[in-house]
């Protein structure tokens, strides 16, 4: 530490060098001006309710002269000690810290005045250094310089958007530097901040930093999914490492640096279950508001603690719903926990006062869940064939259904390994229910569709069924009718051959029936199909294809794209909170014996199965138009805005999604065109090229040799890539996440587990089905304890945070200094508002039956909510957040 730094900390005036005549002449030539600034911060103690002492120590430091200092950095004059860097201005300090910062449990921002002595000849500052000499960290939101000369006789403001935690200075090996909101391509960066730009990226890469990362470390690096298992607990807790091998490929996650387990050096050790302080770079962690909202998530996750108490819910049988009335009681407060002892114990370990109120111990305790949308109109509409089919187009997993292009359906599994896996559905099963069409006519008229989970599940089915799960690989055939709705024609349930997988599958085909035992069998067949779809939704459509695949982009962007890079500014809002939510998911959701394994049918094989699906993941096919073409639900149409025409006109996800996709692409095109004049500017952008190389070779390293990756040699490559990233992080995630509680909060509609096979005639189970179909149904699907745990989790996962930032919104109006991108962003917002109106209009149009269905749930999962600034949050069933934030 140099002597001036020590002097600053101790508030001692350093010994000055005797002025020479030349120095005095230089001083006369300079014109010093006062620059008034405003710094917005949030103190740590406002977030950490038990850390009042930190606030007191900060005040003591302030009184002793250990203050928060800022130095502006010139973009015009070089530093005499390092000509590659801009000259530092005089230190300025935050004013009135002691009187402005209050010890409070409310997370309030505080604005401090700061006055800089600035030499006019140094020009406008391009960056600043901040040093925190206090005891504890604080959140630095922004610095704004007011009244800075604009060179034309007027004055302007210079904005520095920071949004970063500043730890005490001794925690860092280099200065904390922040740049103004002006965007620069690498080649256009002012010479005197180029080195700072490059050094900041090196800091974020960590330079192969070893050991476990600490909360103040700002390191972004890659790791395999090797922290899902707990091999030190025994063989039942071992899980394979995902990523780094051809057999089990996977996107990379953020590195934590935790040590290996004792039993397996390839596996990373885990934190205690209730310890949520998993390392992610501090600025990637939830905001104070989001964390407060999300603590409820942790509360629900420890429902496992209450399992012995919850078992007393039933009056007849343990862990079973005796009737649908029992299930309905979950939503009216009739489920009682008579023993408050466990509740009281749980309450005592929650250190946050506001959340103790969630588990009050004031007498009798009741579990009560909000009524899911699926039940609000009718308690039985969910059981109709129309609703069953409609949810494939407008439910919580509308991204799997495809057009049947050959009959019978064919399998793509290796016949040498799995035998004959082709479908056993034949024309005689379905033609009598096809409204006068035969199969060939229906194929030619694009009327046959399929929900096909057969190939995804069959390789794992023997192992899955060796657990408590008893399920099938399913295919569901549907007919597109004249009114635009889909009608189920048949459901095929398949099992591996008893003699082994190589002997093929053994299948049974079930067709619609309404009455008698045949009707009950059909309801069970739909339940098995729903179990498949629920598991695929949670593991693949939701976790893998949004959460997991986007994390490598976040890591690569922070390692290779400077905060002043225009593409960093474009993408950064779409990465908010994702690393934090993914880390928490690894900790309590997708880990061995975690919530997912407890509540979804693949159980311990769930994540391994998602790795198998990742083998076929193609980045370019995540573009919505290409996805629709791949699934055959659209055809190419050069006359349409997106180049495709839907074959199902009333396909709410696709109709709304294409409008959102088009709006995003227009916005990205206008933005990128402003900074990139031609293809060469993309080719010569060193940061973009490094970013793209690292993303392919490290972030998605198991797919580094795939030929489908864009070459990133044209502006169109960049535009399409950024559009796909934003689409995945915002709209695609919203479509598959926020409908969870509205549709699956009533688990019989979206069961996640099946516990026994289809009853065979002549068995006790078949007799039970004949006698009481509802009891047989409930004994087949997710049992009571898993239901309580499952809906507790999806209730939280379906909630918008009260600090949600929706597509078309930014957390600061000054996110860039460039006027044209700001205007383009306003146009983007206006377009999203038009889409909101279009969605409302379509939902009210009675011609579009799939937009509401028998359950009367308007399709709003892709309603942008750009116009909503209320910050109310909760389960709304609408709104596209900028990022995968829950």
From Swiss-Prot:
Protein name (Swiss-Prot/TrEMBL): Linoleate 9S-lipoxygenase 5
Xref: SUPFAM superfamilies:
Lipase/lipooxygenase domain (PLAT/LH2 domain), Lipoxigenase
Q: In which tissues is it expressed?
A: Expressed in roots.
Name the Enzyme Commission number(s) assigned to this protein: 1.13.11.58
| Positions bound to Fe cation | 542, 547, 733, 737, 886
Chain ranges of the PLAT domain: 35-180
What species is given as this protein's source? Arabidopsis thaliana (Mouse-ear cress)
Q: Which gene encodes it?
A: LOX5
Kindly summarize what the UniProt induction comment says about this protein's expression. Induced by the green peach aphid (Myzus persicae). Induced by infection with the fungal pathogen Fusarium graminearum.
């Amino acid at each position: 530490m140099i002597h001036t730094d020590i002097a600053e900390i101790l508030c001692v005036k350093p010994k000055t060098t005797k002025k020479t005549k030349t120095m005095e002449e230089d001083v006369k030539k300079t014109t010093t001006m006062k620059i008034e600034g405003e710094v917005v911060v949030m103190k740590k103690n406002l977030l950490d309710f038990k850390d009042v002492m930190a606030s007191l120590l900060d005040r003591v430091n302030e009184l002793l002269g250990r203050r928060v200092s800022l130095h502006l950095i010139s973009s015009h004059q070089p530093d005499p000690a390092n000509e590659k860097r801009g000259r530092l201005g005089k230190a300025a300090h935050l004013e009135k810290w002691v009187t402005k910062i209050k010890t409070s449990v409310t997370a309030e921002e505080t604005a401090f005045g700061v006055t800089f002595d600035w030499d006019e000849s140094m020009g406008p500052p391009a960056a600043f250094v901040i040093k925190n000499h206090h005891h504890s960290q604080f959140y630095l939101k922004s610095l704004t310089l007011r009244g800075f000369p604009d060179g034309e006789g007027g004055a302007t403001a210079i904005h520095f958007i920071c949004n970063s935690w500043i730890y005490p200075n001794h925690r860092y090996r280099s200065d904390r530097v922040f740049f103004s909101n002006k965007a620069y391509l690498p080649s256009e960066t002012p010479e005197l901040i180029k080195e700072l730009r490059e050094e900041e990226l090196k800091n974020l890469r960590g330079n192969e930093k070893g050991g476990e990362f600490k909360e103040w470390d700002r390191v972004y690096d890659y790791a395999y999914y090797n922290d899902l298992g707990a091999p030190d607990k025994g063989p039942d807790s071992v899980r394979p490492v995902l990523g780094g091998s051809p057999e089990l490929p996977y996107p990379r996650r953020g590195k934590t640096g935790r040590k290996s387990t004792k039993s397996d050096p390839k596996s990373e050790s885990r934190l205690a279950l209730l310890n949520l302080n998993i390392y992610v770079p501090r600025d990637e962690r939830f905001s104070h508001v989001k964390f407060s909202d999300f603590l409820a998530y942790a509360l629900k996750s420890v429902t496992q603690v209450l399992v012995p108490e919850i078992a007393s819910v039933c009056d007849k049988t343990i862990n079973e719903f005796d009737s649908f009335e029992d299930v309905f009681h979950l939503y009216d407060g009739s489920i009682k926990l008579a023993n408050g002892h466990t509740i009281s114990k749980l309450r005592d370990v929650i250190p946050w006062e506001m959340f103790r109120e969630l588990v009050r111990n004031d007498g009798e305790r009741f579990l009560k869940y909000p009524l899911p949308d699926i039940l609000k109109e009718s308690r039985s509409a969910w059981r109709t064939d129309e609703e069953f089919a409609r949810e494939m187009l407008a439910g919580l997993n509308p991204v799997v259904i495809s057009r049947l292009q050959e009959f019978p359906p064919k399998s793509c599994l290796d016949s040498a390994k799995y035998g004959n896996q082709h479908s056993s559905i034949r024309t005689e099963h379905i033609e009598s229910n096809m409204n006068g069409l035969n199969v060939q006519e229906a194929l030619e008229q694009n009327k046959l569709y399929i929900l096909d989970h057969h190939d995804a599940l069959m390789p794992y089915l023997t192992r899955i069924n060796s657990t408590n799960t008893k399920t099938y690989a399913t295919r569901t055939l549907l007919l597109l009718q004249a009114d635009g709705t889909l009608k189920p024609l048949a459901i095929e349930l398949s099992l591996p051959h008893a003699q082994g997988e190589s002997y093929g599958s053994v299948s049974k085909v079930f067709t619609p029936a309404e009455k008698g035992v045949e009707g009950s069998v059909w309801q069970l067949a739909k339940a098995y199909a729903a179990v498949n779809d629920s598991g695929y939704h949670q593991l693949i459509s939701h976790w893998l294809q949004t959460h997991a695949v986007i994390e490598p982009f976040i890591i690569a962007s922070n390692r290779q794209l400077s905060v002043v890079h225009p593409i960093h500014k474009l993408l950064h809002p779409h990465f908010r909170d994702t690393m934090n939510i993914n880390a928490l998911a690894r900790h309590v959701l997708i880990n061995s014996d975690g919530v997912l394994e407890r509540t979804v049918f693949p159980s311990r094989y769930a994540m391994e199965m998602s790795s198998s699906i990742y083998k076929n993941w193609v980045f370019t096919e995540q573009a919505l138009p290409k996805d629709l073409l791949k699934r055959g639900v659209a055809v190419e149409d050069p006359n349409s805005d997106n180049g495709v025409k839907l074959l199902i006109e009333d396909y709410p996800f696709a109709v709304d999604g294409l409008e959102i996709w088009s709006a995003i692409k227009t916005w990205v095109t206008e933005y990128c065109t402003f900074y990139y004049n031609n293809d060469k500017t993309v080719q010569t952008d060193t940061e973009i090229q490094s970013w793209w190389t690292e993303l392919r070779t490290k972030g998605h390293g198991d797919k580094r040799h795939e030929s489908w990756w864009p070459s990133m040699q044209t502006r169109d490559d960049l535009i399409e890539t950024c559009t796909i990233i934003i689409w995945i992080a915002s709209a695609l995630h919203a479509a598959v996440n926020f409908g969870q509680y509205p549709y699956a909060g009533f688990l019989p509609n979206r069961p996640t587990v099946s516990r026994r096979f289809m009853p065979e005639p002549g068995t006790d189970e078949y007799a039970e089905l004949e006698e009481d179909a509802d009891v047989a149904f409930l004994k087949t699907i997710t049992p009571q304890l898993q239901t309580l745990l499952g809906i507790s989790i999806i209730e939280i996962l379906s909630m918008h945070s009260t600090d949600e930032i929706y597509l078309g919104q930014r957390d600061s109006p000054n996110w860039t200094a460039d006027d044209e991108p700001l205007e383009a962003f306003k146009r983007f917002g206006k377009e999203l508002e038009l889409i909101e109106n279009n969605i409302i209009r379509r939902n009210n149009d009675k011609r579009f039956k799939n937009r509401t269905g028998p359950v009367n749930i308007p399709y709003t999962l892709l309603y942008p909510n750009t116009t909503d600034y209320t910050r109310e949050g909760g389960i709304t069933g609408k709104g596209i957040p900028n990022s995968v934030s829950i």
